[in-house]
């Protein structure tokens, strides 16, 4: 059948199972938006306040579901406003397809109105990108973009579509989506060797990251831990893969991980790293990381093997397939001496002391868990509040904690929460933690939450400073607070009212308990501002370039 480019665009989106699209219209994509208008019963378009918010929303949608998030923006500044969101998804291996409009093909390279070379700009932050110069290529290019985003190590793909391509006509043939290409192969000899090392270990430790969540390999990982009594530590991106309360889960590792996890890495004799890249927030001193251990690394991306830390055995493969192949070769085991040692370290973990005269982050987060129960989805911005949430939330769901890990994008949270809420439905409880500085970045997305009546509860830790940077200045820069005390006078309660939502301000725990209970009953979005001390710190902390011997506990 004969269709124009805009009709093909919608047909392929539907063919790929896209039900929700985040974006912002403009001149170069008006043809696409006209077709979306005609197909509003097939695809829900979510209009955000800013293209960056749309990109983060597509990201949040993908993280909450595992499906590909889709974002659409116009040419020039519309496209460049997506860049931070695309880079955020790239660093955390999130499947996303970003569509951008462009000037007509005859005008490309002539510095026309709202022209930007978005294909070149995004080369370092996408798995692949395309510029479609013929309408005949549009359908297959879109299909390739979705396939690439979900295949192997997941990530974002950009498709740039000049305006004349959206109006041109060609023959279109519908196709069924191709199965996602999964890496099912692995080296059986290496898997056997890994099993032998694990079976012989006296102090084994599993260290897992977000790649386990992406590989849908949570259950075989848990089976391994319990079959051989192996304690496990995780990165920020893997919170919830092994639930809170599981005796094998000893907590987060790294710069703001717990004492036990960091001590266990230093003292284990076999370290099994699964779906993690040894980032500099975990392997702070790469040359001595797990220095007493034989290190096994399992990853779907061969380029990550041994990239940051020298390993003894590298296995390329999807974690689910590798772990399932390894499990029958693992002997049931107990490690009583090792577990006793772990328990002795747990007695030394940092536990904040509550102060009844003020509101403290761990109290707030604990109360949120008490009132929400185990099924909530938590989203964060970036800063101290992100680390407090990682440390004190009772993570029970593999996709229940959404945060920007690799890029550390301040302003990520509200857009991501909108995407998660749209993906999971209004009946799903979504709570977003932010700080006053991070929230200032993209709080304009409040209008989106209001427009779509999304019951997102936003908890704002307000210490009136740039908390994480200021903490570093306190510890390492002689308390020289350069540009971290902004002296802002933002009234978040009045601002909430201006956006058309309910806002609260709390200075003690009873006030927060009441405000949060009321927020749970509301149908639309709510902000709860929590006034905390500007000297509140994220502890423990291992300085960059340090190790367990440098840990700061007070």
Spell out what each predicted region is.
Residues 1-331, 367, 371-374, 429, ...:
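N-terminal alpha/beta PP-like core and its mobile active-site loop of ThDP/TPP-dependent enzymes
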Residues 9-10, 14-19, 27, 32-37, ...:
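Active-site diphosphate/adenylate-binding microenvironment
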Residues 24-26, 45-56, 71-78, 133-134, ...:
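Active-site nucleophile and cofactor-binding loops and adjacent substrate-binding regions
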Residues 61, 80, 337-354, 420, ...:
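Charged, low-complexity, helix-prone segments enriched in Lys/Glu/Asp/Gln
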Residues 69-71, 159, 378, 401, ...:
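Well-ordered beta-strand positions enriched in small/hydrophobic/aromatic, beta-favoring residues
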Residues 99, 107-109, 113-114, 306-308, ...:
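Thiamine diphosphate
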Residues 136, 174, 292-384, 509-514, ...:
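Phosphate/pyrophosphate-binding active-site segments
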